[in-house]
Amino acid sequence: RPAGSEPIPLVFVASAGGGIRAAYWTTIVLNCLVKNQDNAGWKPIGMDMNNVCTHRMSMDSVFLASGISGGSLGLAVTKAFKDAPAVPWSEPLGKDFLGPTVAGVAFRDLPNAFVRLRATGQDSAAVLEKSWEKSVRDAKGDLESGFLATAWSTPARLDFPLLALSGTSVTDGCRVTVSALKLADADAA
């Protein structure tokens, strides 16, 4: 930092799982903490956020944001809108994501379980992911560039916050963390 300037806080964010509710609250809390957001007239939970959010910081102060499940989605959406301060980050998460998923289960997966047709198209998880991507894209955000591509603003400069998104492997139940950071040696696992 330049001599005589204010210290820059180093912030780590952890976001718990809990589905779309965790994603929504993650974006609301981060929107409240980051000072480059314009909250004029924004009342996501029935209150004026400018009266609630009094201490703001720069998004670049957040070094690493880690989450699991819905918390990971909230962090990814937040990063997708990092440079779009006019859009409340939680806006894309207020859409109907259950409808397309239920339709896929009811009209493709369930009949296929009985008649063993080779159903083409996406499975329910892919339908849900595509609906998240579409919702963010409709709000002028970007979830589709690729996870690692968004970590670098230029080939020589990381774009903060770095994300460490966790999940569980369906094959063995072990935790899986995806990040642009090298968090452990592959041989240590």
Where are these regions (language model features)?
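Catalytic domains of lipid- and phosphate-ester/thioester hydrolases
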Residues: R1-A189
